[in-house]
Amino acid sequence: MEHPNVLVFVEFPDPTVPTTGFLKGFKYPDAEVVGFYHLDEGESAETVRDAHGSEFDSELEAIAERFEQEGVRAEYDLVFGQDRFAARRQIIERDAVDAVLLPGASNTLGKVLVATRNVGNAERKASLLDIVDQDELLAIDLVHVADPDDPEGESSGEGILKQTASTLVDVGFPELRIDRTVRTGSDVAFELSQAARGYDLMVLGETERDLGDRIFGPIGEYILDERDVPVLILR
């Protein structure tokens, strides 16, 4: 993945901004910083833009400059709407985004936790090394959540993690820095949020629940809300 395009999605009026220490761990991506403002029923984008547009644009420019200072090319845009999931999906499809970053409070990018659901996305997880600077990483741990009703769930999960770890090693990541854990639980979002304690970044593969499910709520945003850990969703 050469110069992957990362959508950095922040919400106004109080956006969470990636810290300088966190950004130092990124390696050669292009960033698209999008600020989203939720319109209440009856509220118009024109009214909000007239009242706060210049203020929000200045904040977005400052965020983009923070990326630029760390060697990450960045553009920015401000969008309005009543559905942030639909807005995010539209941008992802329009701009062929490779990954989505939901910023959190991490000040470094040394410990990364990668959630792995199946063997099929192992190579996509390995593409993490094209976004995160390997030299900054202290550990890249893998986690799989097994179905408690599946008698072979844990053993299957161990196999998935082993193959994912092998893929990471094949692309140059030191095997000694990789740890593997299988958790068992019916609530995947809860199990992953528990596993994310103490990490600087949580990496997920794309699912409808991460990018737009309004019924159960996106897993990525649940983890961010519970742990304030940044989440990177790989497509």
Question: Where are each of the predicted segments found?
Answer:
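Short beta->alpha junction loops
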Residues: 77-82, 179-186
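Helix-enriched interaction subdomains in cytosolic or periplasmic regions
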Residues: 1-5, 58-103
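N-terminal positively charged helical leader segments and presequences
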Residues: 40-58, 64-69
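Gly/Ser-rich helix-loop-strand patches that form or flank binding pockets
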Residues: 81-133, 196-235
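Short, ordered loop/turn segments at secondary-structure junctions
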Residues: 37-41, 79-81, 104-106, 144-148, ...
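Small/aliphatic-rich secondary-structure junction motif
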Residues: 1-47, 111-155, 166-174, 178, ...
